[in-house]
Amino acid sequence: MQIRLKPDYSFFIASSSTMASTSSLGPSTLLSYGSPSRQFPDFGFRLISGHESVRIPSFRRFRVHCESKEKEVKPSSPFLESSSFSGDAALRSSEWKAVPDIWRSSAEKYGDRVALVDPYHDPPLKLTYKQLEQEILDFAEGLRVLGVKADEKIALFADNSCRWLVSDQGIMATGAVNVVRGSRSSVEELLQIYRHSESVAIVVDNPEFFNRIAESFTSKASLRFLILLWGEKSSLVTQGMQIPVYSYAEIINQGQESRAKLSASNDTRSYRNQFIDSDDTAAIMYTSGTTGNPKGVMLTHRNLLHQIKHLSKYVPAQAGDKFLSMLPSWHAYERASEYFIFTCGVEQMYTSIRYLKDDLKRYQPNYIVSVPLVYETLYSGIQKQISASSAGRKFLALTLIKVSMAYMEMKRIYEGMCLTKEQKPPMYIVAFVDWLWARVIAALLWPLHMLAKKLIYKKIHSSIGISKAGISGGGSLPIHVDKFFEAIGVILQNGYGLTETSPVVCARTLSCNVLGSAGHPMHGTEFKIVDPETNNVLPPGSKGIIKVRGPQVMKGYYKNPSTTKQVLNESGWFNTGDTGWIAPHHSKGRSRHCGGVIVLEGRAKDTIVLSTGENVEPLEIEEAAMRSRVIEQIVVIGQDRRRLGAIIIPNKEEAQRVDPETSKETLKSLVYQELRKWTSECSFQVGPVLIVDDPFTIDNGLMTPTMKIRRDMVVAKYKEEIDQLYS
């Protein structure tokens, strides 16, 4: 099955593997849904089979966002040709040709509004949109004075801060390419990225970080210069180092002086000596877990601008909204989010896991952009607070939450927002009775749900903020977490994408927030589900490999054409390596507004094949097990074994609360009981369990920067213990 967003505002589903004109369809069938309205009109649809066309009565459904394709762009003068020098008015979004063009528009619209709050650096900083634009201009000009040229690679190895954003955009504004990574990566990985990318210089967080990598980099890499974003140059270990070192302030001052001279001479020609094309590479982002075969994802300005221009459909941010940022700024998900929100005039605050709880209460953000693990942590924290209450309060809270979840379930049924794989819609009378029953039950539960909002949920909201929406990406959002936050009135919007797709390819909107799904395709984005063996396109509701095509798909892997060809074909289809399905379209029933949404099942490479030949998706079991407060982390194992096993990190604090006399043996027994309890309804059950003490973290290399567990590395670390477990 294939979904395609067409320029005539139509939404197509085709049964063939490639789209064809209606005059050449032959036996294939095409469904066309069309209306230019921006609300939720009655969509008529036309069945076209061969050369015949039949009009079928319209039915009510939600609109799928479809707009005309982006026009081809010509090479443009770079960002440094800004109104600051030429006196031009602010650029319209249609005129953006390179990512840094957005700052010219934002500075003009939101000049004195606060753009960034960076409270945990020394000194703490707060920048307005105008100040941010000027610092980017100064940094870019400072690099130009140092001799940085278009297409040269500059490594940016640093973590979240306002200076990270300034340097990131300053590098892009010169026409150079930034190569990004965080400071928590290993020295070996950073050196490999630097050398493979052919970077010529490096921008780092602070002296402590560079001192850690100095020996390897000075002896094995060629560095034209080094820039420190924070800290003093005097703290650097410079023995035997013959590299020019600049502080952030020196680059900014250098840029200011050069700009002042050019402004005084009325000569802007120096700012126009490079041209940035939309198809030029803007950044190279290396995929997590890079080892022997580097995969540097080349993202162009056009790739990133696609995200910036079209994410507003999913996140209708307004000037003055507060965003809390905690993911690595260099990661594709956070990066695209930041670029987008700064075109809306929002105020972004940087935080971290360490300060998240306090900052949610302190800043009361309208939005938070994060990964599923963070929402799971918030969920667990709320549950823990409820459990610590008196018996009466605990009973009342848990009862009302169950009532609210039942109410929302009924609401989803009568609104037609329940997922199904069934291709055949229900009979009209069955659909009507189902709808009527759900309306009646919802009406009965509504008073108790409103009571819960007043007595319980209001307090939860005051402690976490998130008054508009929590944006989730970078992994699968567990359905129990999804349902819980829906019940208490905190909207979670899930999306899906990869580094190779800049990253978002689909997402849930406020108007069509189908739980359990990743939403509809983004503007200009095509999806198809193919059989992993035959590569044939599968019909709606059938599980297979997800392939996507669109303007956000990468140019390719840097200096790695063979790997690029494995995932990206000549027609532009990118193999995501993920499994999933596309929800069928129904004109009636509880799934009538779910048609076309994407549902993820997991990574194809994560599928466990037992020695019996059975295929198991571990994610289903892991998500179910994580509902237990006794289980902190879990990895399901069993490749080529007769049965499944699991590696589990227990929550010892919670276990001791359940049983204060917990010993090693009783802990294992308790964990196993909890595992059986919460996974009893899963398709497969877990057999032997390995209890380990050390948690999986980013620092020990067992989690990615977006907090996903690296299964292969966990299995490799505990190989001997796993062998003993099965012996």
UniProtKB/Swiss-Prot annotation:
GO annotation, cellular component aspect: chloroplast; chloroplast envelope; plastid
PROSITE patterns linked to this entry: AMP_BINDING
CDD domains: LC_FACS_like
Swiss-Prot/TrEMBL GO biological process terms: fatty acid biosynthetic process; fatty acid elongation
Transit peptide: 1-66
Annotated PANTHER family: ACYL-ACTIVATING ENZYME 16, CHLOROPLASTIC-RELATED, LONG-CHAIN-FATTY-ACID--[ACYL-CARRIER-PROTEIN] LIGASE AEE15, CHLOROPLASTIC
Name listed for the protein in its UniProt record: Long-chain-fatty-acid--[acyl-carrier-protein] ligase AEE15, chloroplastic
